[in-house]
Structure formats: structure tokens, C-alpha cells
């Protein structure tokens, strides 16, 4: 039976000698309606290969198995990973790895389980302190994954899906848009977890896409990160450590932007145009 009540989950964890660890962001989802909404949002179909990051007690794992997905669950906590075996069947629909996801051989383990041009999906209740490194690791794997459906802090979800001109818009937003199409799914109240965290969470779905061509990503992201380190400054000031300010102003004019523009008003497409213009002038 799914563990949807705080009292049931507390008893389950106590029997295992587990006391939720703040350092591991162990806040477990206990709302069955939310679990089903996550499965629907991720559009998991029978036969899909799903990488589940941090399954915990396994309520979401069980919901995905019920729609006949093939789940590869990666759980760092040894006891919780061991207890997930209660969902295993002879069909090997569930495979469990007790590992840190950032040390897990994602390509090696998943590629061998995919058929032809099939792609896997990622579903994760991301540890709050590891949200950025895990997303950075997964979102670049377009050839392996079709989508990521992640639970993150609500304020992080706003940053992930912000539009130019909004206060939450950042270099992180641009990075995600470079590799995917992020979409805000829905808010998840802190009361849907045990123990309840201090803030609400949200579901974000990222549909992975081909990154823009003819761009050195490392150089491009150096520009966007540098620009947003001083987001209230004009680009010609915030990027002066990389380019001559007059060159930045000229490039902004050429791409149809105000020479006094700040980074928060430029879209991904605008930054791409700026990148090409700046490096085009470098070559001449």
C-alpha cells in the first residue's frame, strides 16, 4: 500500500531506524493526488524507461510501476534503497542502485536499457542543496533523455521558468533554456511532505531540445554568468572585463537593443545574437 499519511510514514521510517536528515533534504511526499499529478505531468507511458532520482520510501516509484514504466531508481540512503526491493517483481520492471546520483554512471547504465532511438525520462524530487548540479548534469543529455520532471523549491522553479524582465530571470534561466524548454507545472504545498519543509515546492517539466548551433557553450555561458553577476549594471559595464565597453554598445545596437541595456532584458536569442556579434567583430 502507498504511504500517504504522516503517521504511516513516521511508523515506516521508525521501524527502519530512519530519522529524516536535513543534510540530505529528506522531505518525503505523502500526498497521493500530487504523486498522480507528477506522473501525469511527466507523461510516463507503459514501457518508458524512467530514471528516478531520490525515490525515498517509494510512493512515486510505485505510481510509475502501476503505469508499467521501467524504473531505474537511484537512492543514496542504503536502508531506503534496500526497502525499495519490496516493489521488485520477476519482470525486473524496477532496478535499484544505492548510489549518489552525481557519481552514478548515467550513460552506461541507461543506454544499454534503451531500444533503437528510444529516450528515457527523468523524474526527481531533487535535494534542495543539489538542485543546480543535478540539473546541470542531466539537462545536457538530450540524446539520452526526452524530458526531466523535477520537484524543486518554489523560488527555484520561478528562476527556472522566468521570462526576460522578471526579477527571477538569471543566467541559470538562460542555461536551462539553452538546452530545454522549461515549463512551470504546479505548486506543491509544504504540507504535502513529511517532515514539512519551511517553503513550498513546485513541479517543473523540461523538454530537452537541440542546443543552438555554432556556439562555444563554455564561452557563451561565461558571458551570461558575468553579465548577471552585476545584474543591475548595464551590459557595457558588467561585461567590460571581457570586452571593450564601446564594442559592447555597438554590438547591442546592431542586434536591435538599447546600448544601455541591462542583462535582465535580453532573451536567450538576444544573448546568442550578442555572442555572435561580439565574436564576429573579434575576428575582423
UniProtKB/Swiss-Prot annotation:
Per the record, the coiled-coil ranges are none
User: Cellular location of this protein?
Assistant: Cytoplasm
Q: Name one Pfam family in it.
A: RrnaAD
Keyword rRNA processing listed: yes
Residues binding S-adenosyl-L-methionine are 27, 29, 54, 75, 100, 125
| Reactions that this protein is recorded to catalyse | adenosine(1518)/adenosine(1519) in 16S rRNA + 4 S-adenosyl-L-methionine = N(6)-dimethyladenosine(1518)/N(6)-dimethyladenosine(1519) in 16S rRNA + 4 S-adenosyl-L-homocysteine + 4 H(+)
GO CC annotation terms, alphabetical: cytosol
HAMAP family xrefs = 16SrRNA_methyltr_A
- The molecule here is called Ribosomal RNA small subunit methyltransferase A
Q: Which gene encodes it?
A: rsmA
Amino acid at each position: 500500500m502507498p504511504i500517504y499519511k504522516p503517521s504511516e510514514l513516521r511508523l515506516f521510517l521508525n521501524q527502519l531506524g530512519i530519522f529524516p536528515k536535513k543534510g540530505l533534504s529528506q522531505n518525503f511526499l505523502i500526498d497521493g493526488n500530487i504523486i498522480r499529478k507528477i506522473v501525469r505531468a511527466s507523461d510516463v507511458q507503459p514501457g518508458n524507461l524512467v530514471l528516478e532520482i531520490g525515490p525515498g520510501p517509494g510512493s512515486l516509484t510505485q505510481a510509475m510501476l502501476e503505469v508499467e514504466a521501467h524504473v531505474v531508481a537511484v537512492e543514496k540512503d542504503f536502508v531506503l534503497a534496500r526497502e525499495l526491493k519490496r516493489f521488485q517483481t520477476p519482470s525486473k520492471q524496477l532496478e535499484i542502485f544505492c548510489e549518489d546520483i552525481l557519481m552514478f554512471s548515467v550513460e552506461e547504465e541507461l543506454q544499454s536499457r534503451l531500444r533503437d532511438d528510444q529516450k528515457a525520462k527523468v523524474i526527481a524530487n531533487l535535494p534542495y542543496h543539489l538542485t543546480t548540479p543535478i540539473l546541470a548534469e542531466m539537462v545536457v543529455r538530450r540524446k539520452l533523455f526526452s524530458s526531466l520532471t523535477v520537484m524543486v523549491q518554489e523560488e527555484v522553479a520561478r528562476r527556472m521558468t522566468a521570462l526576460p524582465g522578471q526579477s527571477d530571470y538569471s543566467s541559470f534561466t538562460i542555461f536551462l533554456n539553452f538546452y530545454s524548454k522549461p515549463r512551470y507545472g504546479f505548486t506543491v504545498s509544504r504540507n504535502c511532505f513529511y517532515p514539512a519543509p519551511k517553503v513550498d515546492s513546485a513541479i517543473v517539466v523540461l523538454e530537452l531540445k537541440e542546443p543552438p548551433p555554432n556556439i562555444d557553450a563554455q564561452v557563451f555561458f561565461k558571458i551570461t554568468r558575468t553579465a548577471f553577476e552585476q545584474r543591475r549594471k548595464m551590459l557595457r559595464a558588467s561585461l567590460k572585463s571581457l570586452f571593450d565597453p564601446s564594442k559592447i554598445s555597438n554590438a547591442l545596437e546592431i542586434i536591435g537593443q538599447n546600448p544601455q541595456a541591462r542583462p535582465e532584458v535580453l532573451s536567450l536569442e538576444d544573448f546568442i545574437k550578442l555572442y555572435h556579434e561580439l565574436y564576429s567583430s573579434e575576428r575582423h
